[in-house]
UniProtKB/Swiss-Prot annotation:
It catalyses: [eIF5A protein]-deoxyhypusine + AH2 + O2 = [eIF5A protein]-hypusine + A + H2O. Pathway: Protein modification; eIF5A hypusination. This is Deoxyhypusine hydroxylase. Catalyzes the hydroxylation of the N(6)-(4-aminobutyl)-L-lysine intermediate to form hypusine, an essential post-translational modification only found in mature eIF-5A factor. It comes from the Eukaryota. Binds 2 Fe(2+) ions per subunit.
């Protein structure tokens, strides 16, 4: 969607994202970010890049993601600096996202730096660079030039979906650790393409949570957020609750649960007892998110992700779908609840807020 905003509206979005007042809740900054993503253009790239000075790894990781999704080569120097991390200010989660964003933009000039950091000491960074190189090389190939993205999923994926196949074959490739990560990612996204209603595909993806790569596990959780399938809820709960799980996986699991915004479906076999970490407490998924949002001993990234996820949940279940930037909206009272699309809950809410502004071109 192409969006035109006035200078005053752009200034409001910028101030919200960059927390100029000093007291903007994190979830409002996230929504401003995705509203800016809908606007696009060089000025947005500059605003989002400025946000990378923020101390929150969670926000910086999301900023890097958006820079990649904007597909604007103006972001390449910024993303390269984040990956290089000369001052040591960016954690591996942020650097990984910068590498993935370079892959999303797909510029051939990014290949040297990505190949360099395929030797990085951090596994998530190494693996992301490997996948990003694979994506750019694929995009530049004859096969890649002829490939068409799945219109059902409005995102630039780290890897293109593999050729259509049956679920057991794709599951085998997904779990085959002897295959290159890029190939396994292609199987992952091909399984995603079966959609939220395919319990078999969701369960095949959930089997990937046993993989030894945190990067791999976090991508599955992200896909579950895209799909919003109730069948993924037990496995996502397990990842969020596991204190030994990597923070980046728990972060994606939390936000996926917030975007799904339901307690799932009743078991087809009531006699099957779920493992304790997959069971819902009284109050359901929202109670779990609220618990981890205030846990003093929870990692900051996990705690903040749950706070954002609670906002997603409340948005998805709100009759009027609250827009934190109400002052921008000329048609607030005319908004209608939109159907879920295959993207994250935060992006859905941001798109609705942009639509409410009545300025979509």
């Amino acid at each position: 969607m192409s969006v035109q905003v006035s200078p005053e509206q752009m200034a409001t979005l910028k101030a919200t994202l960059l927390n100029t007042p000093g007291n903007v809740p994190l979830h409002e900054r996230f929504r401003a970010l995705f509203m800016l993503k809908a606007v696009g253009g060089d000025e947005v790239v500059d605003i989002v890049s400025e946000g990378l000075k923020d101390p929150s790894p969670l926000l910086k990781h999301e900023l890097a993601y958006v820079l990649g999704q904007l597909l604007n080569t103006r972001a390449l120097p910024t993303l390269s600096r984040v990956l290089e991390n000369p001052t040591g200010e960016h954690c591996s989660m942020v650097r990984h996202e910068a590498a993935e964003a370079l892959g999303a933009i797909g510029a051939e000039e990014s290949l040297p730096i990505l190949r360099k950091y395929m030797q990085d000491e951090n596994r998530e960074v190494r693996e992301t660079c490997e996948i990003a190189v694979g994506k750019i090389e694929f995009d530049l190939s004859e096969e890649g030039k002829k490939a068409n993205a799945n219109p059902d999923f409005p995102t630039i994926d780290p890897a293109p979906s593999a050729a259509p196949s049956d679920i057991p074959s794709l599951r085998a490739d997904l779990l085959n650790t002897s295959l290159p990560l890029f190939q396994r990612y292609r199987a992952m996204f091909a399984l995603r393409d079966f959609g939220a209603g395919s319990k078999e595909a969701v369960e095949a993806l959930a089997d990937g949570f046993r993989d030894g790569s945190a990067l791999f596990r976090h991508e599955i959780a992200y896909i579950f957020g895209q799909l919003s399938s109730p069948y993924s809820i037990p496995s996502l709960l397990s990842r969020l609750r596991d204190a030994k799980e990597d923070d980046m996986v728990r972060h994606e699991a939390a936000e996926a649960l917030g975007g799904i915004a339901s307690d799932g479906v009743e078991s087809e076999n009531p006699e099957v007892v779920l493992p304790e970490d997959e069971r819902l407490p009284e109050g359901g998924v929202l109670a779990v998110l609220r618990e981890w949002a205030v846990k003093a001993d929870a990692p900051t990234v996990v705690r903040e992700s749950c706070q954002v996820a609670i906002d997603m949940w409340e948005y998805e279940n709100s009759a009027d779908q609250f827009n934190p930037l109400d002052s921008l909206s000329a048609k607030q009272e005319e908004r209608e609840k939109t159907e879920k699309v295959n993207t994250t809950g935060m992006e859905r809410s941001a798109h609705a807020a942009v639509a409410a502004m009545g300025i979509a071109a």
